[in-house]
From Swiss-Prot:
Signal peptide limits: none
InterPro entries assigned to the protein according to its UniProt record, in alphabetical order: HD, Homeodomain-like_sf, WUSCHEL-like
A GO molecular-function descriptor: DNA binding
Residue ranges of the annotated DNA-binding region, renumbered to this chain: 25-89
UniProt key word Metal-binding: no
Organism annotation: Arabidopsis thaliana (Mouse-ear cress)
Subcellular location: Nucleus
Official protein name in the record: WUSCHEL-related homeobox 7
Amino acid sequence: MSSRGFNIKARGLCNNNNGGGGTGAKCGRWNPTVEQVKLLTDLFKAGLRTPSTDQIQKISMELSFYGKIESKNVFYWFQNHKARERQKCRKISTVKFDHRQDTDLSKPRRDNVRRHQLPAKG
């Protein structure tokens, strides 16, 4: 506990295999078990992107068998996973676009054209 009354949490205190539960030090962050991650990933790969409130509750009840979990953990897992997938797609499409620009030799790039032009006579 700090002098201001805030609880200071060290990283790694929740590295147990029961999803952050247990009798050890209390941790404010959910640490999913391998089984929980596998089930969530399988649902995501099957096409579930934005589960409804009912679906979230059913999923969290199912996942609670493998360790401590709350509905908000499921909600945020899907939100984060969807955002990371979008980010990855954007990064891949940007790389493909840049690569296509670098390998397209049929049209000279603007900066190359300017560099090789003769100075204007005046």
